[in-house]
Amino acid sequence: MQSVTEGLEVSDMIKRILSGCLVIGIVAAMIGFQFIFPYSLNIIMALITATAVFELVSAVGLRKYLTFLLPSVAFALAIPLIPNQMYWSMVTYFLYTIFMLGSTIYHYKKVKFQDICVVYGMTLLVTTALNTVSLMRYLNPQHCMLYVVMALFAAWIADAGAYFVGSFIGKHKLCPNISPKKTVEGAVGGFIINIGLIMLMGYLYNLIFYGSQLSVSYLSLAIIGGVTAILSIVGDLSFSIIKRSYDVKDFGNLIPGHGGMMDRFDSVVIVGPFIYVNK
């Protein structure tokens, strides 16, 4: 029985590695295409956000109610496509709220108010937070893609580091009631790995694009690496609570070994805004 379990764990690890490589390839292509068609980042983030919200609504159990599903997905799709447009963004927020309130009244006897609140609140959070990744390209044309890469990989490196370290030496459970596989050793390992790789990312960016001519604060990068590692865990555990509450293992199965789009971007929901405000 133990060998079977170990075999399944190895298989899951291989799936995670292969899927992770695919995601990295997609991000690399996204970065390259960004220089040809800058608006491509907004389109990609809109599709990612809409998919994540669709999975979220499905997990809560409201997918069959189109009056909740369609406005939520449409809102998630629209916001990244109208960045830096405060007026139209506010109109979109207002219309989404009106649709959700109207749907709540219409389905009052059929749907739990708690479920509606989860869908509405998390749709606002996920959409607004992931939209910060789209907004990063307006911050500084010279370094905007570094911010985007850092927002994505700071979350993923910490998660991957924690997973692999925890898989090999993890003994003490971090939050067994929320995420049984997460360990203290994994969290510490992810923290250290994230700091090291974020500093390496800054070094390579300076070396490749500027011939080491920029003045890089490695202390700042180390702090960013440490803080984002912690925020990554917070994001992961927060969305794990939702999955636990609705008795689902993953939000979806779009990415083998990782789950759905929401599973892959749950940490980015917290890390993205941090990178954006600390640009």
Give the predicted meaning of each segment:
Residues 2-226:
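Membrane-embedded alpha-helical bundles of polytopic integral membrane proteins
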Residues 276-279:
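Juxtamembrane boundary at the C-terminal end of a transmembrane helix
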Residues 102, 234-250:
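Transmembrane alpha-helical segments of integral membrane proteins
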Residues 166-168, 243-247, 269, 274:
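Re-entrant/interfacial helical elements at transmembrane boundaries that shape
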Residues 19, 162-163, 182-194, 232-235, ...:
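Alpha-helical transmembrane segments that form the membrane-embedded catalytic/substrate-binding core
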Residues 244-266:
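Interfacial loop-to-transmembrane junctions
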